[in-house]
UniProtKB/Swiss-Prot annotation:
Name listed for the protein in its UniProt record: Large ribosomal subunit protein bL32
GO biological process terms, semicolon-separated: translation
NCBIfam families linked: rpmF_bact
Pfam families: Ribosomal_L32p (PF01783)
Family matches, as HAMAP family: Ribosomal_bL32
Signal sequence extent: none
Amino acid sequence: MAVPKRKTSPSRRGMRRSADALKQPTYVEDKDSGELRRPHHLDLKTGMYRGRQILKPKAEA
């Protein structure tokens, strides 16, 4: 069975765990509609992605 040769210091343990934190998602303002959306994702309100119509826009209710 594998046994560590040295005790892991709190600093090293913290550095290892630093990559485990959840990142806050980034948002960009859409040029056409002004709505916030994720980068590299299509805008669900307008149905546009990179200047092209991908989906039909949602009907205003």
